[in-house]
A protein has these predicted regions:
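Conserved PLP-enzyme active-site core in the AAT-like
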Residues: 197-367
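Short beta-strand
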Residues: 190, 443-449, 495-500
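Conserved PLP-binding catalytic core of the aspartate aminotransferase-like
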Residues: 444-487
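N-terminal mitochondrial targeting presequence
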Residues: 1-44
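N-terminal entrance/gating region of PLP-dependent enzymes' catalytic architecture
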Residues: 45-185, 485-495, 510-516, 523-528
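Short loop-beta-helix segment that forms the pyridoxal 5′-phosphate
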Residues: 177-203, 251-254
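PLP-dependent enzyme catalytic core of the Aspartate aminotransferase-like
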Residues: 466-470, 499-535
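Active-site C-terminal subdomain of aminotransferase-like
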Residues: 289, 308, 333-440, 461-462
Length: 535
């Protein structure tokens, strides 16, 4: 350290000692003041003052200030469509704008509030009515309140004694969701995301087919094969890897031109599997595929599974919410025949992330698969019904409560409120589809989208009237990401894009936020034209 630094450090120590003597003389808290002196002495080797530990009142004010920030910047801010969906910065730019480094000494609360402001400044606002980038979004006030309560209480939902209200709300929500699926004697659990729900179901299938493997393991088993469609979520293959079956043994079933699994192709693969001496174990059918929003033919798939003794799982993470609507529940016709079903409430239902459920047709499945004797945690002589110690039947021990926020939302809205949300999202998607049909600069990827995924191309003037050959689609594939980047940088709109199979890159709109309206759908198309007409 140079002389100037030493003198500065000495001055700080001197000031700290004076403050210490004066404070003791006034009879204030000795321990806190002593801590302040220790921190001041440390400053001799640092470039700036290290703050003392904030008082309880100061910490309370910090929480209040941050909460007010949340209300102003997000809850109220996203109601104004002039608020940018995102103030996009690259990783390199963010490193220049924000100090991400962690240090030995803490920061002053004013600095922390400034950092919190920057989190709002540079985050994508998924609650904005013009956020269409992924299959989550919206901002539900009751869900946010439930999340806040959950974090403040900070309970672990494995036993009733430490999380009584949380476990009771979880049981209530699960029982209600089971009714919508049609599982009259089922059970379920909340999971950390839809991929985990799909994983748990695949693991349950093995234990259903080979219950002895709970203790003996998979050694000596024949080759186990799972199946999924070309449009299934990638977790179907990842879970095959994680469970030791291998991606080579996750067989992909062909889809029709609407993105639906072809049952005849599924059965062909099942017969081939058997001919090879392997065991057809598990199939993932999808309710609302990620890209095209397609619903597989569940009744036909269920018949094949029953015939060949295959566990049928429905990944309804995205499309399960159609069950909430009398008008659209037919999309899920036959899902009650499946052995398990995944449903993400943080998608169409707009619960705050994360809020995922997996449901099983047969009660007792989870206990048979996962329960162990854990006397330090799951005793049988407690002063309440230990069936509410849900952790005994799960793979996880530490588990956050994801049920309270959804329970509060359901209490506030009722079934009818969620039905209106789904119907509004469907109305928006159908309006957008009709506008695309009417405007010559747009073209639908599939003629009749059945859910709220609306896949389409924008055809700029430079490609109008040209032959749709390989070069045409190559140019089209490069134009769409450019338009997306322009909108992202201006902050006006976030919408995804993707290719699928042999279909070249297109825009993939996923509509779920019920605060969006027909004007927002028009804005999407107008904004794309505005940013792409010169390409």
């Amino acid at each position: 350290m140079n002389i100037s630094g030493l003198l500065t450090g000495y001055g700080r120590v001197k000031l700290g000692i004076c403050s210490f003597n004066e404070t003791v003389h006034r009879g204030k808290n000795f321990a806190r003041t002593y801590q302040a002196v220790k921190l001041t002495n440390r400053a001799m080797s640092s470039k700036q003052d290290a703050p003392s530990l904030a008082s309880a009142d100061e910490q309370d004010k910090f929480i209040t200030d941050v909460f007010e920030m949340c209300m102003k910047r997000v809850v109220q801010g996203t109601r104004d469509r002039n608020t940018p969906v995102v103030n996009f910065k690259t990783p390199e730019e963010l490193k220049e704008l924000v100090d991400f480094d962690l240090t030995t000494d803490g920061n002053h609360q004013e600095d922390l509030l400034s950092l919190c402001e920057k989190v709002f400044d540079y985050s994508a606002l998924s609650g904005h009515p013009r956020f269409f980038n992924q299959q989550y979004g919206g901002l539900d006030s009751y869900g946010v309140a439930g999340s806040f309560i959950t974090d403040v209480i900070n309970a672990n939902v494995h036993t009733f004694e430490i999380a009584p209200m949380f476990l009771m709300t979880e049981v209530a929500v699960l029982e209600h969701m089971l009714k919508f699926v049609g599982y009259t004697n089922g059970e379920g659990t909340f999971c950390p995301g839809g991929s985990y729900s799909n994983f748990l179901s695949m693991n349950m299938a093995r234990l259903w087919k080979f219950p002895e493997t709970k203790s003996t393991g998979i050694y000596g088993l024949p080759k186990l094969v799972s199946f999924c469609s070309e449009q299934a979520h990638y977790s179907a293959k990842k879970n095959s890897t994680f469970l030791g079956y291998g991606t080579d043994n996750c067989w992909v079933v062909k889809c029709d031109d609407r993105g639906k699994m072809i049952p005849e192709e599924f059965e062909k693969l099942v017969l081939k599997c058997k001919d090879e001496g392997s065991v057809p174990l598990f199939v993932t059918a999808t309710a609302g595929t990620t890209v095209l929003g397609s619903f597989d033919p569940f009744n036909e798939i269920a018949a094949i599974c029953s015939k060949h003794k295959i566990w049928m799982h429905v990944d309804a993470a995205w499309g399960g919410s159609a069950l909430l609507s009398k008008k659209y529940k037919h999309l899920c016709d036959g899902v009650h025949k499946a052995d398990s079903l995944a449903w993400n409430a943080h998608k169409m239902m707009q619960a705050p992330l994360q809020c995922s459920v997996v449901l099983f047709k047969e009660k007792g499945s989870l206990e048979r698969a996962h329960s162990l004797n854990v006397p330090y945690l799951f005793q049988s002589d407690k002063p309440y019904d230990v069936k509410y110690d849900l952790g005994r039947n799960l793979l996880q021990c530490s588990r956050k409560c994801d049920a309270l926020k959804l329970w509060l939302m359901w209490k506030a809205k009722g079934d009818a409120g969620f039905e209106r949300q789904v119907d509004q999202a469907m109305a928006n998607a159908q309006y957008l589809t009709e506008q695309i049909r009417k405007r010559p600069e747009f073209e639908l990827v599939i003629p009749h989208p059945e859910y709220t995924n609306v896949p389409f191309w924008y055809i700029p003037p430079s490609l109008k009237g040209k032959e749709k050959n390989e070069d045409y689609f190559k140019q089209l594939a490069s134009i769409i990401p450019t338009i997306k980047t322009r909108m992202q940088k201006s902050g006006t709109l976030l919408v995804g894009y993707t290719p699928v199979g042999k279909i070249p890159t297109f825009f993939r709109m996923t509509v779920m936020n019920d605060k969006a309206n027909f004007s927002d759908m028009d804005f999407v198309l107008d904004e794309i034209v505005k940013n792409g007409k010169d390409l």
